[in-house]
C-alpha cells in the first residue's frame, strides 16, 4: 500500500525543486533524476500536435538512445505508436506489452533491440489541444502490480508539472501557431461542420452568400487548408468550434 505521507512529501519537494528553474535544461534534469528514482533507465517526453491529420507533427525529448529517437522520428512512429494513440481516447497509463503492440510489431521489436523492453506511458491534454505523453523504460524487470499504482501517480504528477513548466517557459515543443477566429468566422465554421452550404449559411445568418464565401477564404488561409471542409475539420480538432 502506498505511503500517502511519503507521497505528499515527495510531491511537495518536486514542486519546490521545479519552481525556481527558469530553463528547460534544468526542468529535464529534474525529470531524469525522478525517473531514475522511480526505477527506470530512460524517459521520453513527447508532444503530438493535432494537425495535420495524416502526418501530425510529433516531437520527442528524452534520454532514449539518440539513434533510436532519430529512427523513431524518421519512420514517423509517433503516428502508429499504440502507447501514444491510446492518449487520443484515454488519459489512463498503459503498461507496454506484446498485446499493446500487436499491430505495431516492427516498432515494438526495434524498441526492444535498443533496450526499451519494459515501460509505461501516460498521456495528458496540453494547452492548444496538444497531446503530451511521458514514457519511462528499462531493459528488464517487469512492472509488478505492486509498482503500477505508484508509477501511475508519480508519472501523472511529473507530466502535469513538466507540461505546465514548459508551457510557462514557452518551450518550442508546446508552442503552436494560434488560430484566432472572429465570432462570425466561428459561426460559419460551425454551420459548415454541420454540412450546410454557403447559400444555406447565408440564409441562416441573414448575410449574402458572397460574404460567406469571403469569410471561408479568410478561414482557409488561417488554417492553411485547401478547402472549407478541411478548415472546419481542423477547427473542430483544435477545439475552436
Swiss-Prot record:
What does the similarity note say?
Belongs to the autoinducer-regulated transcriptional regulatory protein family.
Question: Assembly and interactions?
Answer: Homodimer in the absence of any acyl-L-homoserine lactone. The presence of the autoinducer C4-HSL has no significant effect on dimerization whereas N-(3-oxododecanoyl)-L-homoserine lactone (3O-C12-HSL), the LasR inducer, is able to dissociate the RhlR homodimers into monomers.
In the induction comment, the record states: The rhlR promoter region contains four different transcription start sites, two of which are included in the upstream gene (rhlB) coding region. The rhlR gene is subject to a complex transcriptional regulation. Expression is dependent on LasR and on different regulatory proteins such as Vfr and RhlR itself, and also on the alternative sigma factor sigma(54). Expression is partially LasR-independent under certain culture conditions and is strongly influenced by environmental factors.
- Domain HTH luxR-type positions: 174-239
Q: Where in the cell is it found?
A: Cytoplasm
Lineage runs: Bacteria, Pseudomonadati, Pseudomonadota, Gammaproteobacteria, Pseudomonadales
Residues the UniProt record assigns to the DNA-binding region sit at 198-217
Phenotype upon loss of function: Disruption mutant shows defects in the production of rhamnolipids, elastase and pyocyanine. It also exhibits reduced LasA protease activity and casein-degrading activity.
Means of activity regulation: Activated by interaction with the autoinducer signal molecule N-butanoyl-L-homoserine lactone (C4-HSL or BHL), the product of the RhlI synthase. Is also activated by binding to rosmarinic acid (RA), a homoserine lactone mimic produced by plants, which induces a broad quorum sensing response, including the induction of all major quorum sensing controlled virulence factors. Rosmarinic acid secretion may be a plant defense mechanism to stimulate a premature quorum sensing response.
Q: Which GO terms describe its cellular component?
A: cytoplasm; protein-DNA complex
Q: Which residues form the signal peptide?
A: none
| One of the GO BP terms on file | gene expression
Q: What is this protein called?
A: HTH-type quorum-sensing regulator RhlR
- Domain of life assignment: Bacteria
InterPro entries recorded for this chain?
Sig_transdc_resp-reg_C-effctor, TF_LuxR_autoind-bd_dom, TF_LuxR_autoind-bd_dom_sf, Tscrpt_reg_LuxR_C, WH-like_DNA-bd_sf
Q: Which Pfam families match?
A: Autoind_bind, GerE
Q: Which GO terms describe its molecular function?
A: DNA-binding transcription activator activity; DNA-binding transcription factor activity; DNA-binding transcription repressor activity; signaling receptor activity; transcription cis-regulatory region binding
Amino acid at each position: 500500500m502506498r505511503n500517502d505521507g511519503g507521497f505528499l512529501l515527495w510531491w511537495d519537494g518536486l514542486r519546490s525543486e521545479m519552481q525556481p528553474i527558469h530553463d528547460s535544461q534544468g526542468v529535464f534534469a529534474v525529470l531524469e533524476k525522478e525517473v531514475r528514482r522511480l526505477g527506470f533507465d530512460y524517459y521520453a517526453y513527447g508532444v503530438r500536435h493535432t494537425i495535420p491529420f495524416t502526418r501530425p507533427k510529433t516531437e520527442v525529448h528524452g534520454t532514449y538512445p539518440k539513434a533510436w529517437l532519430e529512427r523513431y522520428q524518421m519512420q514517423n512512429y509517433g503516428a502508429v505508436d499504440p502507447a501514444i494513440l491510446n492518449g487520443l481516447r484515454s488519459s489512463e497509463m498503459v503498461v507496454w506489452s506484446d498485446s499493446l503492440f500487436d499491430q505495431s510489431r516492427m516498432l515494438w521489436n526495434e524498441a526492444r533491440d535498443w533496450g526499451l523492453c519494459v515501460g509505461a506511458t501516460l498521456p495528458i491534454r496540453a494547452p492548444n489541444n496538444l497531446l503530451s505523453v511521458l514514457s519511462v523504460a528499462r531493459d528488464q524487470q517487469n512492472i509488478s502490480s505492486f509498482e503500477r499504482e505508484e508509477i501511475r501517480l508519480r508519472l501523472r504528477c511529473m507530466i502535469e508539472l513538466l507540461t505546465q513548466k514548459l508551457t510557462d517557459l514557452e518551450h518550442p515543443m508546446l508552442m503552436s501557431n494560434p488560430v484566432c477566429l472572429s465570432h462570425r468566422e466561428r459561426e460559419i465554421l460551425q454551420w459548415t461542420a454541420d454540412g450546410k452550404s454557403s447559400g444555406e449559411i447565408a440564409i441562416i445568418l441573414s448575410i449574402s452568400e458572397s460574404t460567406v464565401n469571403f469569410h471561408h477564404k479568410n478561414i482557409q488561409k488561417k488554417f492553411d487548408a485547401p478547402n472549407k471542409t478541411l478548415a472546419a475539420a481542423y477547427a473542430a480538432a483544435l477545439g475552436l468550434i
